[in-house]
């Protein structure tokens, strides 16, 4: 987050900076505490306005995947894997929930 920025504004900015994705920000989806590194990761639902991605210089690759094609072993962060898994489970159940998770 930057000064004078809300968490959702920060998430939208990071999404643009990292993936170059044009999104319509949705609601909070997961809050993941990572105490061993003194971090809290917030993930939001969002809708892509365009499937065109323009990743920033810190990003090696940004692509869209069908759920069955997600390269789980290649995801950089455990919090991303957990969030994607929970989202796919919620979507299959027909109800998107907010998840509060503590990683130990």
Model segments located where?
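Unchanged
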Residues: 1-28, 32-86, 90-99, 103-104
């Amino acid at each position: 987050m930057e000064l004078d920025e809300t968490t959702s504004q920060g998430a939208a900015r990071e999404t643009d900076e990292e993936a170059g994705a044009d999104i319509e920000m949705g609601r909070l989806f997961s809050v993941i505490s990572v105490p061993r590194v003194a971090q809290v990761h917030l993930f939001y639902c969002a809708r892509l306005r365009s499937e065109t991605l323009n990743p920033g210089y810190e990003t090696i690759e940004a692509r869209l995947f069908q759920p069955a094609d997600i390269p789980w072993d290649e995801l950089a962060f455990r919090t991303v894997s957990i969030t994607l898994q929970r989202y796919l489970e919620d979507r299959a159940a027909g109800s998107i929930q907010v998840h509060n998770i503590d990683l130990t």
